[in-house]
């Protein structure tokens, strides 16, 4: 399992499938955002005064993230996206 540091967040991106004439085209389209599930969040970031500011998201949250944000990593067979919390646009409720 990945444990992010600082204000980084590990996401599992929800893949969209588009069907055209019975064929499935995975990842079709160039959306500006992606929907993802938060798998893990770091402890937060420290202010100049040394105070720890906890992340706004937690494991299990569904979030909207910029489509080109972060770094894709593999943990075993699973693919995850590691992003800075600032790249998360909203929590989907």
UniProtKB/Swiss-Prot annotation:
Superkingdom to which the source organism belongs: Bacteria
Transcription in keyword set: no
MF annotations from Gene Ontology: ATP binding; metal ion binding; protein folding chaperone; protein-folding chaperone binding; unfolded protein binding
Recorded name of the encoding gene: groES
Any Gene Ontology biological process: chaperone cofactor-dependent protein refolding
Full protein name: Co-chaperonin GroES
Keywords, sorted A to Z: Chaperone, Cytoplasm
CDD domains recorded: cpn10
Subcellular location field: Cytoplasm
Subunit structure: Heptamer of 7 subunits arranged in a ring. Interacts with the chaperonin GroEL.
Upper taxonomic lineage: Bacteria, Bacillati, Bacillota, Bacilli, Lactobacillales
């Amino acid at each position: 399992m990945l444990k992010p540091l600082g204000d980084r967040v590990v996401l599992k991106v929800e893949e969209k499938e588009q069907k055209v004439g019975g064929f499935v085209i995975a990842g079709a389209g160039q959306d500006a955002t992606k929907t993802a599930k938060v798998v893990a969040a770091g402890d937060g970031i420290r202010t100049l005064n040394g105070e720890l500011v906890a992340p706004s998201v937690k494991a299990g949250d569904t979030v909207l993230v910029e489509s080109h944000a972060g770094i894709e990593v593999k943990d075993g067979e699973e693919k995850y996206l590691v992003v800075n919390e600032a790249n998360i646009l909203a929590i989907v409720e």
